[in-house]
């Protein structure tokens, strides 16, 4: 298998919603991806983000654009089984070589496990809420809140039903370059980014 495999965000979310409605428990994103892969519900072609001619003037417009994003799932298909969840994600398997950042939606009804990765993750709650577990401490975020997760922080994100949470992932090297002048200061915010 040398070609990259892509799946639409909305297909994965539909599987998670259906599974939850039928069984009253959450399936993992990995379960959904493996199910869709076995059903041959994937593509070997990436779909570009299709921004409408006019600006996204409201939350529904933005959500419609983001839910049609195709997610590359090749590393998940190649490196895991439905029963073995990835606990330590590398930016080399998450970003393609020419990509410095990703924007996607967090899944609802996803049995998200504690994990860590070597890149930054920014979650912005646009609607509803999420519960974030960071180093064994739970925090609830509501509409308008955002959370920056530094590399190698053990965390878990659980998104509420009917919630919309945008997730922006950024390579550590890209983040460091973009905020180099900020991290040169000696204050609590600068130290957070320098030492995490």
Where is each model-derived feature located?
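A structured, charge-rich N-terminal accessory region that forms the first stable segment of a protein
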Residues: 26-80
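N-terminal leader/propeptide segments of preproteins
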Residues: 1-33
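Generic detector of bulky aromatic hydrophobic side chains
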Residues: 18, 92-93, 107
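Helical anchoring/docking segments at protein termini
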Residues: 1, 91-92, 130, 157
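A hydrophobic/aromatic-rich effector-binding and dimerization subdomain
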Residues: 5-6, 56-94, 98, 160-196
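Short linear sequence motifs
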Residues: 8, 12, 44, 85-88, ...
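N-terminal regulatory/effector-sensing and dimerization cores
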Residues: 98-189
């Amino acid at each position: 298998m040398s070609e990259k495999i892509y799946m639409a965000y909305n297909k994965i979310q539909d599987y998670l919603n259906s599974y939850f409605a039928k069984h009253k428990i959450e399936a993992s994103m990995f379960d959904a991806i493996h199910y869709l892969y076995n059903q041959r519900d994937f593509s070997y072609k990436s779909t570009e983000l299709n921004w409408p001619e006019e600006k996204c003037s409201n939350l529904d417009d933005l959500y419609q654009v983001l839910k049609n994003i195709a997610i590359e799932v090749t590393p998940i298909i190649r490196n895991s089984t439905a029963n073995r969840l990835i606990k330590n994600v590398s930016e080399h398997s998450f970003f393609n070589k020419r990509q410095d950042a990703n924007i996607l939606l967090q899944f609802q009804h996803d049995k998200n496990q504690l994990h860590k990765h070597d890149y930054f993750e920014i979650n912005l709650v646009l609607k509803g809420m999420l519960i974030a577990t960071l180093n064994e401490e739970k925090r609830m975020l509501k509409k308008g809140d955002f959370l920056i997760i530094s590399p190698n922080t053990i965390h878990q994100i659980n998104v509420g039903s009917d919630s919309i949470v945008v997730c922006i992932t950024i390579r550590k090297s890209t983040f460091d370059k973009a905020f180099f002048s900020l991290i040169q200061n000696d204050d609590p915010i600068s130290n957070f980014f320098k030492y995490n």
